[in-house]
Amino acid sequence: MMNRRSFLLGAGRYLLILLASVIALIPIVWMTTMAFKPAPEWTSGIEQLSWLPREPTLDNFRFLFTGRSAKLLVAIDRIALGPMISSLVCATLGTLIAVTVGTLAAYGVSRFRVGQNLPLSILQLRLFPPLAVMIPVMIMWAYLHLIDTWWGLSLIYGIVTLPFAFWLMMTFFDDVPREIEEAALVEGCTPWRVFRRVTLPMVKAPLATTILFVFILNWSDYAIALLLTRKDWITIPVYMNALSTAMTGQMYGAKAALGLIAAIPPIVLGILIQKHLVRGLTFGALKQ
């Protein structure tokens, strides 16, 4: 009786996981098929929509990089290459700022116990919605001539994601045995050398995980980029929202194609650090 009950519970658990996976995959599948549909298929009524494209085409991708669509006979002034470069530059630099500063601050708090109230203060900053302070930030950025610049957007990305990087890395540093660092200090290493040569290699996997999470946060941001950019440095989410014409309305096919392209950098980054990702997610889960 117990074996049968265990079997039913296990089967039910796997069915729930399967159902959740299918529900999660539906938008991805729909976006993928929409990206390869010709314009008449996604501009027609809802009763004519289908899962698979009847006449697959690359016209939506061509439209993004040329600004013209032969089948729709429309054109846009700005192609997708500029926003893609802007997103890549700003998200990368913002991640570099947040992870570098967050890692150094987390190590200092974890090991030297400086700023006892600093972790709680940083957590409170993270819980505070960034958009609530965007008006004074916009005034400050305008005064410093940082509106619609790569440096201005990268800097605010680094500031907003810094608390997240700090708390992740502080948790990981707390799980590193202090005895190893003390042994290195006894051998004559300076604290900076201990951090660089001993501690940092031990948290390489958690560091890779933090980089991935922070990059995804910066890469997918819409609200901050919408407020702090105008034309030259708009990002992919802002550009995607602007993909519409007076003749056709929303360019759903082009938006789906852009969504597929926008998913490539996080996926590539995840593949590059996949050997560290699982270890980083489970770092410190087991205690000796």
What are these regions (language model features)?
Residues 1-288:
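A hydrophobic, multi-pass inner-membrane permease signature
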